[in-house]
A protein has these predicted regions:
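Generic secondary-structure signature for well-ordered alpha-helical cores
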Residues: 1-2, 118, 139, 159-166
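Short beta-alpha connecting loops at secondary-structure transitions
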Residues: 117-120, 132-144, 295
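Long, contiguous, secondary-structure-rich segments that constitute the structural scaffold
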Residues: 144, 150-201, 273, 294-309, ...
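Catalytic, metal-anchored helix/loop core of enzyme active sites in primary metabolism
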Residues: 111
């Protein structure tokens, strides 16, 4: 006990649930003829620098000149860093289309919104490679108002482009579910296991696979026979250094582990102006930004603002009290928050969950105060390195002060005003 290491302790919840490596129903993404993709954390860079050069994972690439954005699934106004910079870049494309069930900040910054159904309004199948169940997601209510399934939205778009039949393959929603389930069932049977037919599965509501006789241990096959079960590395072994990465010649990422001082931490010169290190973490009251207007998330807020935790010494030094509304700020932006005095934090560190919907005091104006408490108005938007180009949200310095004056209302949880055509 207490030895080794593992992965997947977070939201995926895969630890302690061993399963056989069996197929699950999944829809192929198909082939994208654009043959172009960027690291997701570099969205703002792409919009700011059409045709600009960047390095990624050993490749020298060029950002596309993006004139149109179609966003379905996800929300950059939740997960991206330095949201004020993103907002400025967001105005550069000619057209932005969003497929979305809710009036999120993303939907509010779109030219066209396709109202999409929620999981309650459509039939679907839930499955994961990390557990032993396949679930039938039965439709609970009919699509509300003008909401439509994403599949139907894209089928109509395909028809407008002249290839509806090629896209749908002459299947509707339920026919696709049956097809995907039957295909997975065939693969499972080839692996020596059994699954009920689709009708029995749909009526029962789930399929449960048997638990393996032995639990899963990371790298167990490799340890038992490194020759027959090599790892997918240059040496086919566990590596602490990579000759391949070394050859990339990246100044910010050599081929071996090194420690380098972050640009923003408490020993950097910027800490004289912004002495508190902000950590942003996954919320306990919602999934990322999903469910933020729900009662569980709302019950956790303080005067309607996202909680911010601070050590008692830091609060006392600033004359702040538990439950008070405060303003967190740096040179990138500012947001309001509800203060929680917490002795479990290290002095000099403050912590705030992600996921509060961005609610600018002046909508559409970069730099406007977020009255709700989205920490990504504060975080830095630079790549981790030329190798990975990931986010560096946890390297962020801020200052905290008391909010003085009337509290602005939270407006992002209510639908925006809708102008009728011809009005």
């Amino acid at each position: 006990p207490g030895q080794g290491f593992a992965f997947g302790y977070g939201s995926i919840n895969g630890m302690g649930t061993p399963r056989h490596e069996l197929a699950t129903p999944a829809l192929s993404a198909g082939h994208n003829p654009a043959a172009s993709a960027i690291p997701v954390a570099r969205i703002t860079d792409m919009l700011e620098n059409p045709g600009g050069a960047y390095d990624y994972n050993g490749q020298h690439r060029t950002y596309p000149d993006t004139r149109m954005i179609f966003w379905a699934g996800g929300n950059p106004f939740h997960h991206h860093q330095d949201l004020n910079r993103l907002l400025r870049a967001w105005s550069r494309p000619d057209t932005i289309v969003v497929s979305e069930p809710w009036w999120t900040t993303l939907a509010r910054h779109a030219d066209i919104v396709f109202p999409a159904t929620t999981t309650m309004e459509r039939n679907d199948i839930a499955a994961s490679s990390r557990d032993r169940f396949i679930l039938a997601m039965h439709q609970v209510v009919k699509p509300q108002a003008q909401a439509r399934n994403d599949f139907d939205i894209f089928a109509d778009l395909a028809e407008a482009c002249g290839f509806r039949e090629k896209f749908t393959e002459q299947r509707d929603e339920f026919a696709w579910l049956r097809f995907l389930y039957d295909r997975a069932r065939h693969q499972v049977q080839l692996a020596g296991h059994d699954m009920p037919d689709f009708d029995k599965f749909w009526a029962a509501g789930h399929v449960e696979f048997p638990q393996p006789a032995q639990g899963y241990t990371q790298f167990a096959d490799f340890r038992a026979d490194p020759v027959a079960k090599p790892l997918r590395t240059e040496s086919k072994k566990i590596q602490l250094a990579s000759a391949r990465i070394e050859k990339f010649g990246y100044a910010d990422c050599p081929g071996h582990p090194v420690w380098r001082a972050p640009q923003e931490w408490q020993l950097s010169p910027l800490a004289e102006k912004f002495p508190l290190h902000l950590l942003s973490y996954q919320p306990a009251t919602r999934l990322h930004g999903q469910g933020d207007p729900g009662r569980v998330s709302l019950a956790s807020k303080i005067h309607g603002r996202e909680p911010l935790r601070m050590h008692p010494d830091d609060a006392a030094a600033r004359g702040l009290a538990d439950g008070q509304v405060v303003r967190a700020f740096n040179d990138r932006g500012a947001c309001l928050a509800g203060l929680v005095v917490d002795s479990g934090l290290r002095p000099g560190v403050v912590a705030m969950a992600t996921g509060a919907w961005l609610d600018p005091l002046e909508p559409g104006v970069p730099g406007s105060l977020c009255v709700h408490g989205n920490p990504n108005v504060l975080t830095r938007d630079v790549g981790t390195s030329a190798l990975g180009q990931g986010p560096v949200a946890q390297s962020c310095l801020v200052e905290i002060e008391a909010w003085v004056g009337p509290l602005p209302p939270i407006r992002v949880h209510a639908p925006p005003p809708i102008a009728e055509a011809g009005a």
